[in-house]
Amino acid sequence: MTQTKLSTQTTTDNNQEDNDVIIEQFLDSIWLEQGLSANTLSAYRLDLQALSQWLVTQKLNWLSVTTLDLHAFLATRLDEGYKATSAARLLSTLRRFFQYLYREKLRQDDPSALLSTPKLPKRLPKDLSEQQVENLLSAPCIDEPIELRDKAMLEVLYACGLRVSELVGLSLSDISLRQGVLRVIGKGDKERLVPLGEEAIYWLEQYLQYGRPALMQGKTDDIVFPSLRGQKMTRQTFWHRIKHYAVIAGIDSEKLSPHVLRHAFATHLLNHGADLRVVQMLLGHSDLSTTQIYTHVATERLKVLHQQHHPRG
């Protein structure tokens, strides 16, 4: 790979172009090494472009920026309303990028090594009770093709614990109704097989036979859940559909998130005695600690039930 040599001169428009080239070289490198998703690469690119533009205003460049400068940059992001989670992601991006510059001998040091991680509040995922999930899944009017599609999508989400991006990205070749499993391509293009369950299989069969043909309008694309125009549905569109059905189901908007059924899937499995590592595998988490947050949700629910029903609660 051809490397762009860093200049010690004050950043100019030409050096701004060099910055962009180096960013793309870095993204190519981590994509090849780790197989990151397009969404992750896009987030890295936006973070580094923001830093590059800030460096121009400070008359700095990749070679001259120091740890104190990076602290100042992070502070400006927080002042602009960055949430702690976004700041933590930005810090991760900076560390990876400057480690890359150091490894490739484009810098003699790593100014990100001494950066501190913002303290993140421990948030429990928003979850729904089993009755609330039942109300949500019952909200679509299955007489209409679009609502039959939505019914199938909601059932699959809850049955399989998918991310919304995984759901809208499903192809017909990913579904085996005979075997009762889905092939899911998750983060980092990692593949996993997830069982569907009887309800999801039934509603998928109904939708594929009666709903999908009307939405596809003769198109031969492999998309499982098309939009009204027969094209791939966006995550934002499905999020609007979830909010629509939540209103019908009488669910408080504070309880909602795009992954509300994924969270319910994990919590309800644990409530019914599922092993944590099995839930980790079904969710497609690479790290068990990511899954362990759901044990706190299950514990909190048990505390509430104890207080409500135990004579000394």
Swiss-Prot record:
Protein name (record): Tyrosine recombinase XerD
Keyword Cell membrane: no
NCBIfam families according to UniProt: PRK00283.1 (NF001399), recomb_XerA_Arch (NF040815), recomb_XerD (TIGR02225)
Protein source organism: Proteus mirabilis
GO aspect biological process, one term: cell division
Domain of life: Bacteria
One Pfam family here: Phage_integrase
Gene giving rise to this polypeptide: xerD
Main localization (coarse): cytoplasm
Function: Site-specific tyrosine recombinase, which acts by catalyzing the cutting and rejoining of the recombining DNA molecules. Binds cooperatively to specific DNA consensus sequences that are separated from XerC binding sites by a short central region, forming the heterotetrameric XerC-XerD complex that recombines DNA substrates. The complex is essential to convert dimers of the bacterial chromosome into monomers to permit their segregation at cell division. It also contributes to the segregational stability of plasmids. In the complex XerD specifically exchanges the bottom DNA strands.
Sequence ranges assigned to domain Tyr recombinase in this UniProt record: 123-307
Activation/inhibition comment: FtsK may regulate the catalytic switch between XerC and XerD in the heterotetrameric complex during the two steps of the recombination process.
Keyword set includes Cell cycle: yes
Domain Core-binding (CB), chain residue ranges per copy: 17-102
Family: Belongs to the 'phage' integrase family. XerD subfamily.
Sorted UniProt keywords: Cell cycle, Cell division, Chromosome partition, Cytoplasm, DNA integration, DNA recombination, DNA-binding
GO molecular function: DNA binding; tyrosine-based site-specific recombinase activity
Gene Ontology CC, one term: cytoplasm
Record lineage: Bacteria, Pseudomonadati, Pseudomonadota, Gammaproteobacteria, Enterobacterales
Assembly and interaction partners: Forms a cyclic heterotetrameric complex composed of two molecules of XerC and two molecules of XerD, in which XerC interacts with XerD via its C-terminal region, XerD interacts with XerC via its C-terminal region and so on.
Subcellular localization: Cytoplasm
CDD domains: INT_XerDC_C
Residues the record marks as active site: R163, K187, H259, R262, H285, Y294
